[in-house]
Amino acid sequence: MHFPKKKHSGNLSVVELPKEALQDSLTAAQITFKRYAHPNGNAGSAERPRHLKVESAPVVKSEPSLPRMRQPEPRSINHQYSRETLPGHSEAFSVPTTPLQTIHYDVRNKASNSPSSIAAAETAAYLAHTNSFSNRSSGVGSRDPVMDTETKPPRAPSALKNELQLNRMRIPPPSYDNNVRSRSISPQVSYSTSLSSSCSISSDGEETSYREKSTDEAFPPEPSMSSYSLASKASAKASLTDPSQRQQESDYTAMNKLNGGNIIYKGTLPDLIPRSQRKTSKPRFKHRLLRSPEQQQENLSRVYSDQTQNGRAIINTQQNVKLKTTMRRGKYAITDNDETFPYDRKSVSSDSDTDEDSNVMEIKDKKKKSRRSKIKKGLKTTAAVVGSSTSVLPFPHHHHHHHQLHNPNSHHLHTHHHTSSHKFNEDKPWKSHRDLGFITEQERKRYESMWVSNRYSYLRLLPWWPSLANEDDESHLQPLNLPQDGLMLNLVVKDIWYRSNLPRDLLVQIYNMVDTRKDGTLDRKSFIVGMWLVDQCLYGRKLTNELDQRVWNSVDGYVLGTINVKPATSDHYHNANNPLDKPSKLSVRQELKNIKRDLRNVRI
């Protein structure tokens, strides 16, 4: 005879029952059925009833002498956990972790004649009868090696279910009196009946085990244990402990790692997330970002307030380690209202606060310093320009140009550029561009350096230069009228000007404008003016047909008090030859605009 596989609702472990335990359970079920089927003592009747009826069930009275049940041999834990496969059948058996609650009530309340005890006893007898009758075709000793899966146990009568529902509230709590326990049926009977009831056949989807339907509705659930050995040991020691101690043990087993691991450590170890809350502690990423700090504080207070209500074990260590910084946010962050951490929390947030404040202060100081330096530079340049002793211009707004002409380091003091000083960049000459109409001192020095380094080069290539053959004949030598500063060959000038990448026709036009000797060479003045015209073309100015005399004069001397005012022919007071005469109204307006623009550029 074989029992089918039944998966326990509480624990998912499947354990095969040994052959000796199967035989003992079947024997106990048969004895229990015979006893309750024939209460008058006719236990030896050959024919057994097929169904039990609650209406005609006789009242079982407590008898002084009860039949002694055969005690099974004690087995060790390793023997109970051993798996044995029956021949011809590969399925495993599922053993319940705890005995049925109805069987405990029947064993412990055997002496009482209450209808609840009678109903519980009849339920156990019915379960034993259905399993033994459906699976056994011959005597107790003879068992079929092959299980017939098509046979189904008869359904429980409706009267028995109604009686269980009526007596649900009248079932007394289990008593742990040693006298009553000694006069009741031995624990092997309850063990066998619970085993047989849990091993019922469940082939169809609509037909489930009787234990899940009846016991869950009629009796309150108890914390089940996760192994067969633990259940047997706990039932053996139940009578030796008081109810308070049993409650503590049940709480401990419920809090143990075998049943979820709801143990919270505090002190040296951080707060561990319980296994039951891991799914709920990982919400969506959107809710994490959009969650307000008030909700985080509520979640934190709820977690610490539910520790004692849920009966979780809190392990407080003696060494309370204070961590200054942490990466954990949300409901696991430390707050001022949290009483579970006794140490001071001021130093926890002091590091981050001081770092942020110091960074902000440093940025503010840098901004203030940069602004102060700019104001100081503006004041210095303004004082240098206004306080110059060489300012003899007729109009006060022309002091910029006057200072630029006499101060070689003041090329940055103009209305179109910043006040910060910078050197001339040959690759970017337009950054130092000023539309003055003449050559400044800095430009002249730059051009003169190129003149000095390239003059007197390759002059022997000239046709009019005396050759080496004529040097021996001193009578035919004629003195050369060379300028004091020297000469530069036109081929050298062409090579230098080609570096500007200007069009060739434009360079030819510039050369023709500055060539005064007409002998294939350029003197110092022509070379400097030609270089200045090349730079003006690079700055974007158009080349004029004639050069102003101021440009030629600025090569050898300084230009003082130059006013760029175009003569107006409509004004009869203006004389082009006298720049100090009364200007026109249009020029006055233009000068006022220049003054206002200069005042805006000066940063005070």
Curated annotation (Swiss-Prot):
Residues 276-290, 366-379, 396-421 have a biased composition (Basic residues). Residues 176-185 have a biased composition (Polar residues). InterPro entries: EF-hand-dom_pair, EH_dom. Residues 469-559 form the EH domain. One of its GO terms (biological process) is fungal-type cell wall organization. Residues 186-203, 224-240 have a biased composition (Low complexity). Belongs to the IRS4 family. Interacts with INP51. This is Protein TAX4. The gene is TAX4.
